């Protein structure tokens, strides 16, 4: 349900962009994002930090897009948000010496430090890749191509990254599970 709520503004943006235009789509995106935040607060009583970053960026750049009738602002949003996430992951690991991914998921998953570090770097690389490909597509292709990429390309890339993360973690989680079973059998 939560993931569906996160996709609704994007889907509405895409449909309105294809049928009406940039200004209308940007305004629908902003309105849907505000409604999404209200729904998240009512249903889950909490809005995550990454959702706040995305939501504030959507409202800010969406309103600029609507006001100036220029999709460039939403294109910049994708680049800027991906840059923020990549920098946050890298700073957490190299400045604060604790991967952000570990801070977010460390209570749910017990993994060796090197696995957390590789996972953190993998996601930083993913956000950098998305940032670069967004710049290329937004600068060298039409707005329609960019809108398709934003909705389908980035969503597909994100899905691939999540699946890749699962495949990377699977052997480590399996080892952990076996250790726990062995510890349980010796008691």
Curated annotation (Swiss-Prot):
The chain crosses the membrane at residues 24-44, 53-73, 76-96, 121-141, 151-171. It is found in: Cell inner membrane. Pfam families: IspA. It is a multi-pass membrane protein. InterPro entries: YciB. The keyword Cell membrane applies. Its main location: membrane. One of its GO terms (cellular component) is plasma membrane. Keywords: Cell inner membrane, Cell membrane, Membrane, Transmembrane, Transmembrane helix. It comes from the Bacteria. NCBIfam families: ispZ, PRK00259.1-2. Belongs to the YciB family. Plays a role in cell envelope biogenesis, maintenance of cell envelope integrity and membrane homeostasis. HAMAP family: YciB. This is Inner membrane-spanning protein YciB. It comes from Glaesserella parasuis serovar 5 (strain SH0165). The lineage of its organism: Bacteria, Pseudomonadati, Pseudomonadota, Gammaproteobacteria, Pasteurellales. The gene is yciB.
């Amino acid at each position: 349900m939560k993931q569906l709520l996160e996709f609704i503004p994007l889907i509405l943006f895409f449909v309105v962009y294809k049928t009406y235009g940039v200004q209308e789509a940007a305004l629908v995106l902003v309105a849907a994002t505000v409604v999404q935040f209200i729904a998240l607060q009512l249903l889950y009583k909490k809005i995550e930090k990454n959702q706040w970053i995305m939501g504030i960026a959507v409202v800010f750049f969406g309103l600029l897009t609507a006001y100036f009738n220029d999709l460039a602002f939403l294109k910049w949003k994708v680049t800027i948000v991906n840059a923020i996430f990549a920098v946050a992951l890298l700073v957490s690991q190299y400045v604060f010496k604790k991967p952000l991914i570990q801070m977010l998921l460390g209570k749910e998953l017990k993994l060796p430090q090197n696995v957390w570090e590789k996972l953190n770097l993998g996601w930083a690389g993913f956000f950098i890749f998305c940032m670069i490909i967004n710049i290329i597509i937004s600068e060298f292709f039409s707005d329609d191509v960019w809108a398709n990429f934003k909705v389908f390309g980035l969503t597909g890339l994100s899905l691939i990254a999540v699946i890749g993360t699962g495949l990377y973690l699977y052997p480590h989680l399996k080892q952990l599970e076996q250790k726990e079973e062995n510890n349980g059998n010796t008691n």
